[in-house]
UniProtKB/Swiss-Prot annotation:
<dbReference type="GO" id="GO:0006281">
    <property type="term" value="P:DNA repair"/>
</dbReference>
<dbReference type="InterPro" id="IPR023400">
    <property type="entry name" value="RecA_C_sf"/>
</dbReference>
<dbReference type="Pfam" id="PF00154">
    <property type="entry name" value="RecA"/>
</dbReference>
<dbReference type="GO" id="GO:0006310">
    <property type="term" value="P:DNA recombination"/>
</dbReference>
<feature type="compositionally biased region" description="Basic and acidic residues">
    <location>
        <begin position="338"/>
        <end position="347"/>
    </location>
</feature>
<comment type="function">
    <text>Can catalyze the hydrolysis of ATP in the presence of single-stranded DNA, the ATP-dependent uptake of single-stranded DNA by duplex DNA, and the ATP-dependent hybridization of homologous single-stranded DNAs. It interacts with LexA causing its activation and leading to its autocatalytic cleavage.</text>
</comment>
<feature type="region of interest" description="Disordered">
    <location>
        <begin position="325"/>
        <end position="347"/>
    </location>
</feature>
<dbReference type="GO" id="GO:0003697">
    <property type="term" value="F:single-stranded DNA binding"/>
</dbReference>
<feature type="binding site">
    <location>
        <begin position="65"/>
        <end position="72"/>
    </location>
    <ligand>
        <name>ATP</name>
    </ligand>
</feature>
<dbReference type="InterPro" id="IPR049428">
    <property type="entry name" value="RecA-like_N"/>
</dbReference>
<dbReference type="InterPro" id="IPR003593">
    <property type="entry name" value="AAA+_ATPase"/>
</dbReference>
<keyword id="KW-0234">DNA repair</keyword>
<keyword id="KW-0233">DNA recombination</keyword>
<keyword id="KW-0742">SOS response</keyword>
<dbReference type="GO" id="GO:0009432">
    <property type="term" value="P:SOS response"/>
</dbReference>
<keyword id="KW-0238">DNA-binding</keyword>
<comment type="similarity">
    <text>Belongs to the RecA family.</text>
</comment>
Length: 347
């Protein structure tokens, strides 16, 4: 580029930075090699499936699936992980169904969890936006998109039709939220339900409420489904759950994480350490027996889970070795640069 054109471009960029702040315009190459900043999901299996070691910060995440599949459980584990690293969490309970005792059992510090139970959708999304724009909240969970009922629908009669109201509400909210979420480095998790399209003869009839906006704005979309029941004798104690990464803008998609969700306890950390340990040759399996470093831990997966609960040192050792082998950090992964750099900053 000749000098006159370069001077003209420099002047324009300086004016932009005066008007809109430092970092309003950057060269793409300045960001190459910059590691994605993440926060752990609370599950080493899901961290691995996401490809970057957890949920990317400053992005929108959608978790959807059938009823009682474990969507809220997955989100609560992320909140517990953020809080354990000194972060601040907020929960927008549009369904008015959060169980504080269950949240506490999953490791959530309920005394320091900011909770809102909004009267209507607009209020819930405005509260979420206020939390994000504050820059002081690390994770915001909205449970659920389907329960964000527009004010007009709540104030109307029971039989009134409100075509596309919720979709328009979500579209407008996400247009406002997406930029603020990126700047504040907040992880925003939207939990969603499943509906069926009427009259679909071919293909998948399932869809998610709230229009298409959330599908577009989400960097990660997770589909949560129960695979099978887990039994201890005749008693059903939990579910084997499949979490499929349907969309991923920060790593290759379509990877699947299989976890054990135990009733009243959440994701079994011991269960996933056993499964991943066997896959990665850290835990040895011979028939129904499991052993570590030549020492037998037990016969059958449930017995080995109990062994790991009773021996936290061995559990931590297996966890550390797994994270090292898979290249997953324990906790937050920070970016190399905290703030955007001006094109005119001196090296």
């Amino acid at each position: 580029m000749d000098n006159d054109r370069q001077k003209a471009l420099d002047t324009v960029i300086k004016n932009m930075e005066k008007s809109f702040g430092k970092g309003a315009v950057m060269k793409l190459g300045d960001n190459i090699g910059r590691r994605v900043s993440t926060t752990s999901t609370g599950s080493v299996t899901l961290d691995n499936a996401l490809g970057v070691g957890g949920y990317p910060k400053g992005r929108i995440i959608e978790i959807y699936g059938p009823e009682s599949s474990g969507k809220t459980t997955v989100a609560l584990h992320a909140i517990a992980e953020v809080q354990s690293n000194g972060g601040v969490a907020a929960f927008i309970d549009a369904e008015h169904a959060l169980d504080p005792e269950y949240a506490q059992a999953l490791g959530v510090d309920i005394d320091n969890l900011y909770l809102s139970q909004p009267d209507h959708g607009e209020q819930g999304l405005e509260i979420a936006e206020a939390f994000v724009r504050s820059g002081a909240v690390d994770i915001v969970v909205v449970d659920s998109v389907a329960a964000l009922t527009p004010k007009a629908e709540i104030e109307g009669e029971m039989g009134d039709t409100h075509v596309g109201l919720q979709a328009r509400l979500m579209s407008q909210a996400l247009r406002k939220l997406s930029g603020a979420i990126s700047k504040s480095n907040t992880t925003a998790i939207f939990i969603n339900q499943i509906r069926e399209k009427v009259g679909v003869m071919f293909g998948n009839p399932e869809t998610t409420p709230g229009g298409r906006a959330l599908k577009f704005y989400s960097s990660v979309r997770l589909e949560v489904r129960r695979a099978e029941q887990l039994k201890q004798g005749q008693e059903i104690v939990g579910n084997r759950t499949k979490i499929k990464v349907v969309k991923n803008k920060v790593a290759p998609p379509f990877r699947v994480a299989e976890v054990d969700i135990m009733y009243g306890q959440g994701i079994s950390k011991e269960g996933e350490l056993i499964d991943l340990g066997v896959e990665n040759d850290i835990v040895d399996k011979s028939g129904a027996w499991y052993s570590y470093n030549g020492e037998r831990m037990g016969q059958g997966k449930e017995n080995v889970k109990m062994y790991l609960k009773e021996n936290p040192q061995i559990k931590e050792e297996i966890d550390r070795k797994l994270r090292e082998k898979l290249g997953i950090s324990d906790g937050d992964v920070e970016e190399t640069e905290d703030a955007p750099k001006s094109l005119f900053d001196e090296e």
